[in-house]
Amino acid sequence: DAYKKKLFHLCEQFKISNQVKFIDSCKNMALAYKVSDIIVSASIEPEAFGRVAVEAQSMEKLIIASNIGGSNETVINEKTGLLFESGDPKSLSKKIMQALTMDESLLKTMGIEGRKNIVKKFNVEKMCFSTYSEYKRLIN
């Protein structure tokens, strides 16, 4: 489609075609995350959960996500990932440049911190207790 062609053209114009991969659909997401260094979730509409941000962090990958919806709650800016102003391409491009110029050890550390964050927030015991507490609140 026209938008995709425009994105390809921009990648060529800025000489980053070899560094950017556009994926339409993927059957093996674990592998896709594994071979990636940085994940971008550029949602312009709030997602209730922000699954891409959670998946990326669980795979110890740096996530760059818009600061709305679930991503805003699961990504700790500058610690477990990078948040940008939703709908602001300049904010997104600054975060991408920050990630691309980041020291490899910091990139790794942020990935590890992201996984710790997700495991802490979304372990089965905590989620069950949270669900139980909500049901209890609704019943009373």
Show which residues each predicted segment covers.
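Acidic donor-binding loop of glycosyltransferase active sites
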Residues: 34-48, 61
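Conserved donor-nucleotide binding/catalytic region of nucleotide-linked donor-dependent transferases
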Residues: 98-116, 120
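Conserved acidic donor-binding segment of nucleotide-sugar-dependent glycosyltransferases
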Residues: 77-78, 82-89, 98-104
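Short hydrophobic beta-strand element within catalytic cores of glycosyltransferases
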Residues: 62-65, 75
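Short alpha-helical segment that forms part of, or immediately flanks, the ligand-binding pocket
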Residues: 30, 48, 53-58, 72-73, ...
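Active-site donor-binding acidic/aromatic loop of nucleotide-activated sugar
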Residues: 2-4, 17-26, 32, 82-83
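Short acidic alpha-helix that forms the nucleotide-activated donor recognition element
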Residues: 22-36, 58, 76
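C-terminal alpha-helical cap of glycosyltransferases
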Residues: 116, 120, 124-140
